[in-house]
Amino acid sequence: MRSNIRYALWVRAAALAAGMFLVPQAPRAQSAEQVHPYVSPWKTPWDYEGARGNDHWGDLDPAYAACKGKEQSPIDIRRTQKAALPALRFEYHTGPLQYVINNGHTIRVNYYAPGSGDFLVFGDERYQLTQFHFHRPSEEYVRGKRYDMVLHLMHETREGKVAGVAVLLKAGAANRAVQEIWDHMPATEGQNLVSALDLNPASMLPDDTADYYMYMGSVTAPPCTEGVTWFVLKTPITVSAEQISAFAKLYPHDVRPVQPLNGRIVKESK
């Protein structure tokens, strides 16, 4: 029991150190949106390519050692094991976004909702939504297929357990919620926008969330913390070609290559 608690605290500490799972704070009262400098949480800079790219992450900083681990993400979902998995329950509500951040690697939204907050419920576990961000193209492959983009909704329990929900995005009709975020995202790297926008993250979920893949993996950027439960929804949502292009102007390729499974089992809901 003590080792489990220590491990959970270690996962939480490592994730917090990288700014990937910030527990939301209530936003300041404000009459209009404000832009502030963004202070990077990464002590050692990294990138997706070149001398600081994925192949070198594990050597850039001792804090990034997990990037050389055996349970890394993303993966190519090919062989799966059918399982009677619990339904995913999304207890999402309309609430104010805390920050819309251009952090030099992606557009990330720190989410805050008053009251009980917004939760992903899986079995007996309740994971609170802390932030979401985007990648282009998708980091995940499904049987060799990559999608135009992916949305990662990141959640955490009080004990520090982390769960990510991957929503695959494909070109098609425009998504109103995504457009609202695009209309408020800072165009300049290193900007942190205090948002006056209210949003329900459920508006970025597909109508069908019953079918999904599940596996144990990691954060997909340094420090690559392992112990993350990933849920990859089978049904994609659509975004317009213009919305994809708008993101691509900032981040044309913010993806980590797929990582070896190393014997991990990918479960598929029946």
Regions found by a protein language model. Name each.
Residues 11-22:
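Bacterial N-terminal signal peptides
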Residues 2-7, 27-270:
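Alpha-carbonic anhydrase
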